[in-house]
Amino acid sequence: TAQLWVRDDAVKSIADLKGKQIATTTGTTAHVFLDRALRSARLDPTKDVQIVNQRMAEAVTSFVSGAVPAVALWVPFDVTVKQKVANARKIVDASAFFPEAAIMGGWAARNDFYDANKPALASLIAAWTEVNDAMLANFDAAAETLQKTQYKQVPLADFKESMKFSKYYTSAEWRKLYQDGTATKWLQQVTDFFAVAGNIASPVPASKYFDPQLFLQTVKA
């Protein structure tokens, strides 16, 4: 759901951001996306641009006010930009870097809790897959319910458009991605980013902190 927006007509491409400030929230999906986008244009995120770290609402406010010429955000903050900055332009979004910059949402548990509560966690997985598949089977209705109950401040049309920027899979598709190692690979990509960005010397590999087996045991082929 991450996007890169600019307001300067002189900025035609990512490469044109060299030497400029870009507001975002570091350590988030928007930051991972921005790093990938800059490197795709042969820009060093640590040397060729100045990344301004702010909470996303503040980053968007800085962009709207003209304090910074670019912002890397996630939806639905793009709605604010489109409403308040007439000349704002989106020059790239995360879909351009999928699956190289794929970021998964999920849940984490302490090892002791995980070991002692596998039946409860299996029930959580089963409930999630049921809701996930029902949502995908009735996407428009699900979007309307979410907007009505959780995102009233976002117009329904904008909310539905925002939902299109995420990638969704059925439980059967997720099972394949878990089984063939794709999900672990996507997690490792994010680990690699934070190892560099956070100067982590010996990060725990995804294969050690991610266990796909409970999902595979719960969601049958």
Positions of predicted regions on the chain:
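Amphipathic, soluble alpha/beta structural segments
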Residues: 1, 155-161, 213-221
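Residue-level signal for nonpolar/aromatic packing positions in well-ordered secondary structure
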Residues: 4, 17, 34, 63, ...
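Short coil/loop linkers at secondary-structure junctions
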Residues: 39, 44-46, 152-154, 200-201
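Pocket-lining segment of extracytoplasmic ligand-binding domains
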Residues: 57-152
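Secondary-structure end/capping motifs
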Residues: 115-199
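Conserved C-terminal helix/tail region of periplasmic/extracytoplasmic solute-binding proteins
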Residues: 187-221
